[in-house]
Amino acid sequence: MVASAPLATDATANPQRGSYWITTFGCQMNKADSERMAGILEAMGYREASAELDADLVLYNTCTIRDNAEQKVYSYLGRQAQRKRSNPNLILVVAGCVAQQEGESLLRRVPELDLVMGPQHANRLETLLLQVDSGQQVVATEDHHILEDITTARRDSSICGWVNVIYGCNERCTYCVVPSVRGKEQSRLPQAIKLEMEGLAAQGYKEITLLGQNIDAYGRDLPGITPEGRRQHTLTDLLHHVHDVEGIERIRFATSHPRYFTERLIDACADLPKLCEHFHIPFQSGDNDVLQAMARGYTVERYRRIIDRIRERMPDASLSADVIVAFPGETDAQYRRTLDLIEEIGFDQVNTAAYSPRPNTPAANWDNQLPEEVKVERLREINALVERCARKANARYEGRTEEVLAEGINPKDPSQLMGRTRTNRLTFFSATGADGHANKAGDLVQVRIDAVRSFSLSGSPLPH
């Protein structure tokens, strides 16, 4: 369970603190953490810098799920370390999963660092920076209860917001470093989640995405049993609890785990009108033996039953997933079964990755690693299939009218707005309708889809 945070002190409100810059690597959880840390910095008196090289405080919120993301962090750090040698007042912070994984060894590798902090400490940024102010070089990577955030996040969007509902992960997938860097599951209380959503609604937000590394596990660490003998707090119960927040038009959630994706959850998504018809459910492999080696805890048959039930209740629902190719020992036949499953289900989008050995994971030590050329070829082939499936899935939208939540101006064409359908299709459309009505960010617009591409739609707003 997430702990309550103490109130900030007046001593931290310093308008002379200078400017900050945050660079975020990785997942939506990291992006949400960065928004909260930006809010903390601004409450302390920092302002956002116009460029990284102008900032008085530089924070890298890091990701370790893939080796290339980790190496990119060290490249960025090298530039900032050189800058700090000529500007000792620069404050240099590494947060997130690389910080948690490397800990004090980061200080040995980059001695110019002032603060190394794991993701469990994001809401303690203020306290940790005060220690830096006193001349300390700080490492905060110990396991800790995650504090409720009492500082307003500085969010990148004023229309769509992320709300964390559970932190950490208790799974032990053999390829994944997340449990060791994000810690055990810690669920927020339903009333705290709803209160945050009500605050966002009061600011004009229209869509909320509930976030968790394994969101279907929500509530497992909270006390309480219902008269029927089940857990009192589940994701299904949470969706019912927050559904009536006035002003919020749409609710999404991510990321799901097939092991815990229940029929009761599917029924709630079908019955609650604010729940969007888009589901991101990683399957990782289309072969049962590979899934067992990954310690995923489900079979391909179980995954198919989930998809069948979703389509039975919500025939037009869109489906996205994650998949890993070239897992240690994966044969060509096993890989082909993954391709077959993608084509059979007809995913709208699949995030693909070649297996990357990560420190402190069982699979990294196995002696059946596949050659790099196999990884490259399998990734190339599966990406081509994913694009074909996405284009085919999008083709069914041509000529249809879809509700699109306008999120902002298309940066490539200021005459257009961009937003997403309920099924999460990125859609571009004219800001001004044929009737002269000017649509704006935050509007729910009925858009006739005139053209489709692999990963986006474009269309025309219907008259009001």
UniProtKB/Swiss-Prot annotation:
Annotated [4Fe-4S] cluster 1 binding sites: C27, C63, C97
Main location (coarse class): cytoplasm
Subcellular localization(s) per the UniProt record: Cytoplasm
PROSITE patterns linked: MTTASE_N (PS51449), MTTASE_RADICAL (PS01278), RADICAL_SAM (PS51918), TRAM (PS50926)
Cofactor: how bound: Binds 2 [4Fe-4S] clusters. One cluster is coordinated with 3 cysteines and an exchangeable S-adenosyl-L-methionine.
Cofactor(s) the protein requires to work: [4Fe-4S] cluster
Residues that coordinate or bind [4Fe-4S] cluster 2: C169, C173, C176
Domain MTTase N-terminal: 18-134
SMART domains: Elp3
Record keywords: 4Fe-4S, Cytoplasm, Iron, Iron-sulfur, Metal-binding, S-adenosyl-L-methionine, Transferase, tRNA processing
EC class name: transferase
GO biological process: tRNA methylthiolation
Domain of life: Bacteria
Keyword Iron recorded: yes
Reaction(s) catalysed by this chain's protein: N(6)-dimethylallyladenosine(37) in tRNA + (sulfur carrier)-SH + AH2 + 2 S-adenosyl-L-methionine = 2-methylsulfanyl-N(6)-dimethylallyladenosine(37) in tRNA + (sulfur carrier)-H + 5'-deoxyadenosine + L-methionine + A + S-adenosyl-L-homocysteine + 2 H(+)
InterPro entries: Elp3/MiaA/NifB-like_rSAM, Methylthiotransferase, Methylthiotransferase_CS, Methylthiotransferase_N, Methylthiotransferase_N_sf, MiaB_methiolase, rSAM, rSAM_horseshoe
Keyword Iron-sulfur part of the UniProt annotation: yes
EC number: 2.8.4.3
PANTHER family tied to this protein: CDK5 REGULATORY SUBUNIT-ASSOCIATED PROTEIN 1, MITOCHONDRIAL TRNA METHYLTHIOTRANSFERASE CDK5RAP1
HAMAP family, A to Z: tRNA_metthiotr_MiaB
Family: Belongs to the methylthiotransferase family. MiaB subfamily.
Name of the protein in its database record: tRNA-2-methylthio-N(6)-dimethylallyladenosine synthase
Organism the protein comes from: Synechococcus sp. (strain CC9605)
Classification of source organism: Bacteria, Bacillati, Cyanobacteriota, Cyanophyceae, Synechococcales
